[in-house]
From Swiss-Prot:
Keywords: Glycosyltransferase, Magnesium, Pyrimidine biosynthesis, Transferase
Name this polypeptide is given: Orotate phosphoribosyltransferase
PANTHER family linked to this entry: OROTATE PHOSPHORIBOSYLTRANSFERASE, URIDINE 5'-MONOPHOSPHATE SYNTHASE
Gene name for this UniProt entry: pyrE
Pathway: Pyrimidine metabolism; UMP biosynthesis via de novo pathway; UMP from orotate: step 1/2
């Protein structure tokens, strides 16, 4: 499953690997990878494979789920498809409460005591997913965990999720993606080394000259 999804993401350009010409993230950090899972919305076969995979993860790890919650905005569509497949209620969670109307942060019903699974598109440092989890917990929901399309497997993300006491499972990850990219001839040994070094310590730009 991990390599299949990784292959899909590479084929449609949802993930770019540029170890020799790094991207600059909004945080200012240099990165050899850029992920835009919103592109999956435009490819029916890919998004169907993702929805099926997320459903499988949820049934395996969180079988008692009662509500599917999407993170705004990238997780909303995938949460909708998954909730439809599972015939479950769905809601989505904003990064912060609206400044007008009812001032909702959670849109749709997520009632006190309900068991919720969060659908996220990407786990980087885990910040947006944890914000979603905290909002649901404040509303009295029991958050069973998070499922996502892809994770960078960063230690910072793992630590934040552990600190928030929330389980997280992804369809694919950085390790599988780099392996598939190498198998497809998209990167060579030198590029693979840079990618491996970046993941060990993203904040240390020494990987650029590795």
């Amino acid at each position: 499953m991990k390599k299949e999804i990784a292959s899909h993401l590479l084929e449609i350009g949802a993930v770019f690997l540029q170890p020799n010409d790094p991207f600059t993230w909004s945080s200012g950090m240099k990165s050899p990878i850029y992920c835009d899972n919103r592109l999956t919305l435009s490819y029916p076969k890919v998004r169907q494979a993702i929805a099926a995979g997320l459903e499988e993860l949820i049934k395996e790890h969180f079988p008692t789920v009662e509500v599917i919650a999407g993170t705004a905005t990238a997780g909303i569509a995938h949460a909708a498809w998954v909730s439809d497949r599972m015939d479950l209620p769905m809601c989505y969670v904003r990064s912060k409460a609206k400044g007008h109307g009812k001032g909702n942060q959670i849109e749709g019903k997520a009632e006190k005591g309900q068991k919720v699974v969060v659908v996220e598109d990407l786990i980087s440092t885990g910040g947006s997913a944890i914000t979603c989890v905290e909002a649901l917990r404040e509303a009295g929901c029991e958050v069973l965990g998070i499922v996502s399309i892809f994770t960078y497997e960063l230690e910072a993300g793992k630590e934040k999720l552990e600190a928030a006491n929330v389980a997280s499972y992804s369809l694919s990850d950085y390790s599988a993606l780099t392996e598939v990219a190498a198998e497809k001839g998209m990167i060579g040994q030198a590029e693979t080394k840079k990618l491996q070094e970046w993941r060990k310590n993203p904040a240390n730009e020494a990987w650029i000259t590795a």
